[in-house]
């Protein structure tokens, strides 16, 4: 049995490792969802509104129950529909025969316009197209253009302008369904939008205006550089140097930015310089001057050290400004995210994903798998270090005798050397009699 303090510490470490694994799993699932959404077909935002209108078959339920027509209205609507169908048949027969005059047509149109609340049934003979209606029914406040009814197809009432087109319009292939086909033809369903994939049509995406402007400037500058004749003359070399300086000035400012590696190297040099300055200052302060000349030399040395310290502080401020301009970098595995030596020791709560450069999807898959494998190995190494710090003192403090000590050694060897996967088995041979 392990001591209580050791057990609590080990349980806390294991719980922290499990929490880190769960958080890593959530991050991987989120990244996987984003990748799948990018690799699937993209639906353009402009085509979402272009949906076909619901037809007579799909419009089974009325979205406005308060506007449901009464049976009397439905009956009057049926009479009007029959009258319009008869008028269409009469018009088709008159057009085929060629016996229609324009004056009766205008007269019938004026009759239809003046009697806005009545509907006429056409005469029985084609020659009497301009006659009065034989059967009229009042329309009691019918205001809906389209009225769905059970057992009847959806029909649309014609306004005064539509009635004029019935009197003067072109032919229709069918008397009943022709009107509905003509009215539904303009609102036909558009074709389905073509699938947009990032692999095939990613080059069609447009960058923001600032990026496009910078890219055009960069391409024009490189075009000028490539057009410059390559020669060994000093004028051409000076012109190229001046041109590259102009490119750096136009792209990133008067001075090039320091990279993260350069910042780390410079910070290391500053640390070494600070340690040397500290040692030199201790030596000067600990030495007791024998005369005024030694004291004067000591003061001069301290003034020089103070000037060097000021230069180091100024350089440190420049490095901090360079780090502040750079985007945040991902924290290495095994290092607490609260402080990073590459960032000057400042705390950064959120880390951006690491930028991967790859040439194929297989290479990207290999990079991701190796990155996960390295993270797992780092976690295992950290846990083994914790186990070594907790278990080795117990083994060294125990008395090397008896089965309990052997069992403890086997358990420690299994945890530290085998990763807990295998346990050694000790065989004892009985002495021969």
From Swiss-Prot:
- The highest taxon in the source lineage is Eukaryota
Keyword DNA repair among record annotations: no
Subcellular localization is given as: Cell projection, Cilium; Cytoplasm, Cytoskeleton, Microtubule organizing center, Centrosome, Centriole
Q: Name one GO biological process term.
A: positive regulation of smoothened signaling pathway
**Residue positions of the PTM Phosphoserine?**
159
CC terms in the record's Gene Ontology section: centriole; cilium; cytoplasm
- Show the segment(s) annotated as Disordered: 45-69, 95-169, 326-345
Q: What are the protein's UniProt keywords?
A: Cell projection, Cytoplasm, Cytoskeleton, Phosphoprotein
Compositionally biased residues, Pro residues: 327-339
Query: Bias regions of kind Polar residues — which residues?
Result: 107-120
* Primary site of residence: other
Keyword Cytoplasm applies: yes
Biological role: Acts as a positive regulator of ciliary hedgehog signaling. Required for centriole stability.
**Quaternary structure note:** Interacts with TEDC1. Found in a complex with TEDC1, TEDC2, TUBE1 and TUBD1.
Please give the name of this protein: Tubulin epsilon and delta complex protein 2
Q: Which organism is it from?
A: Homo sapiens
């Amino acid at each position: 049995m392990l001591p209580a303090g050791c057990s609590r510490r080990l349980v806390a470490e294991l719980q922290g490792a499990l929490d880190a694994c769960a958080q890593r799993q959530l991050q991987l699932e989120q990244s996987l969802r984003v990748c799948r959404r990018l690799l699937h077909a993209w639906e353009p935002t402009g085509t979402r509104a272009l949906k076909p209108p619901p037809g007579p078959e799909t419009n089974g339920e009325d979205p406005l129950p308060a506007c449901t027509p009464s049976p009397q209205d439905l009956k009057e609507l049926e009479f009007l529909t029959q009258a319009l169908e008869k008028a269409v048949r009469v018009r088709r027969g008159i057009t085929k025969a060629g016996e229609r005059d324009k004056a009766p047509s205008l007269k019938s149109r004026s009759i239809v316009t003046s009697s806005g609340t009545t509907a006429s049934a056409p005469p029985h003979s084609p020659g009497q197209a301009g006659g009065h209606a034989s059967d009229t029914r009042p329309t009691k406040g019918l205001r809906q253009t389209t009225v769905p009814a059970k057992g009847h197809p959806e029909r649309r009432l014609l306004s005064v302008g539509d009635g004029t087109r019935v009197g003067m319009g072109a032919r229709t292939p069918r008397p009943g369904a022709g009107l509905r086909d003509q009215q539904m033809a303009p609102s036909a369903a558009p074709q389905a939008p073509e699938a947009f994939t990032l692999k095939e049509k990613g080059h069609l995406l447009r960058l923001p205006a600032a990026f496009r402007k910078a890219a055009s400037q960069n391409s024009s500058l490189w075009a000028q550089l490539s057009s410059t004749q390559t020669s060994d003359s000093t004028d051409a070399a000076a012109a190229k140097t001046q041109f590259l300086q102009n490119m750096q000035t136009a792209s990133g400012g008067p001075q090039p930015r320091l990279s993260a590696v350069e910042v780390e190297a410079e910070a290391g040099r500053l640390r070494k310089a600070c340690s040397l300055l500290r040692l030199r200052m201790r030596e000067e302060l600990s030495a007791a001057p024998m005369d005024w000349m030694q004291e004067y030399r000591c003061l001069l040395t301290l003034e020089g050290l103070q000037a060097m310290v000021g230069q180091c502080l100024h350089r440190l401020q420049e490095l901090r400004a360079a780090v502040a301009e750079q985007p945040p970098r991902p924290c290495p595995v095994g290092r607490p995210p609260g402080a990073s030596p590459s960032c000057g020791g400042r705390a950064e709560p959120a880390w951006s994903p690491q930028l991967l450069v790859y040439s194929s999807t297989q290479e990207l898959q290999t990079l991701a798998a190796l990155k996960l494998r390295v993270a797992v190995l780092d976690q295992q190494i950290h846990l083994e270090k914790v186990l070594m710090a907790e278990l080795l003192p117990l083994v060294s403090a125990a008395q090397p005798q008896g089965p309990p000590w052997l069992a403890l050694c086997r358990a420690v060897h299994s945890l530290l050397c085998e990763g807990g996967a295998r346990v050694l088995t000790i065989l004892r041979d009985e002495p021969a009699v």
